Amino acid sequence: MSEEEKKVYLEDWRSAKEWGGFLYSIERWERIAEVEKIVCNACKEICLGLREEELLGLLAEGGMKKTLKEEFSEDKAKDARYLEYIVVDDVLLLDAHREYGGEVTKELVRQMLLGKEGKDIDKRYVDRVAGVVRERQRKREEETERSVKELVGDEEKAKSKEEKAKSKEEKAKSKRGRKGKSASAPSEQEEEKKESEVEEAEQGGEVEALPVEVGGARSKGGKKKSKGGRKCFKIHRRVLRWTKSPEKIKEEWDKGSEERWKGRSLEEIKEQKIVHDITGVLELLRSEDADRFFMDAGKYRKGGSERQRMVAIGALETGGQRMTGVVEVGTFKDGDGCPVVYHLRFKPTSIGSIGDVINPGVVEASDVGRVDEGEECEDADKFVYPKGVRFETVKETGSFQIVWKNPSDTSEVLRRLIVYCRPCVI
């Protein structure tokens, strides 16, 4: 063996020895086992602690961002239902868990499920996540403290009211026992009137402001925002069609060019109207914070036009049933560059089928073949439901609701669609 060959041999042997020591290090495998246990427990806590719609949101958000790794064959990955595997520094995760505790570790795992790449998880990112968790806990504690104070305040008000009632009753008894009631009556009546006015003033702060009519719907939940941040949308006739009566819808579909809707029974049309007649969603879609609710599901070309799909997680309550799923919005741009909504539907979706709902290939295959882009469209800001339909929109911190009510008895809710805010990505 020449000196050169001997040198190469020794280098290979040294490298093999180091790699073998790395692979067979008991300390390393114990560390990996500990990290795996921590991550598995965090996943379990995350999934068990979420409502169905929250878990759908987590899976959908992560699925939008993840891609299959080249090392896996596509078929194998699909069979295993893996979206992605993540390579992350196990020492970093273990140190983070020991330094900050389980809540920060759980948030790190949640961010991985939401699509955070392992290469982006470093010490600086861990510290940032820890700061977010601390701030979240602080706000939670403040909210708890505020709730306790409000509860104590309500109890004190009730106690004060009870004491006033007792005092009033005692005065009334004393009054009945006195002589010369006629002389003292006016002053006592004035005193009772003053007490009554004070009680009414105290209760005045508890009266809620009445909802205001906005764009054909009653809107609750905060001041009306300026139009500066609102987005432009138009509504295609095939979407507006679902706001009509079932009989009229059937008549128009039977005369139309879309084969998928021709010949449907009136019962089928009524069932489909429940999930398609959700045009009130455009109030949210046009708002400046629509991106907090809707995820971009990608673009593709079909039927001669470029289309874009957006989805949001939601729940539909109707007929005593509650269904979780996604709100689908399909758009194309008209000649002026304004997005036209040609597809709008609530699709009931289970945890197991969320992958198909957000898969661009599946979405494209199931989409309508050709949309008549020349048909007259309506500006979304001018849309008003047909006369006799009573609905209102309610915007809250983490959700947006559309509530349909019985026009004859507005206390009766016929249908409710709730659109949920997307999970927080750090």
Swiss-Prot record:
| Top-level division of the source organism's lineage | Eukaryota
Query: Compositionally biased, Basic and acidic residues: which spans?
Result: 136-172
Chain residue ranges for the region called Disordered = 136-230
Extent of Basic residues compositional bias: 220-230
Signal peptide range in chain numbering: none
Family, per entry: Belongs to the UPF0329 family.
**What name is this protein filed under?**
UPF0329 protein ECU06_0040
- Name its species: Encephalitozoon cuniculi (strain GB-M1) (Microsporidian parasite)
Q: What is the lineage of its organism?
A: Eukaryota, Fungi, Fungi incertae sedis, Microsporidia, Unikaryonidae
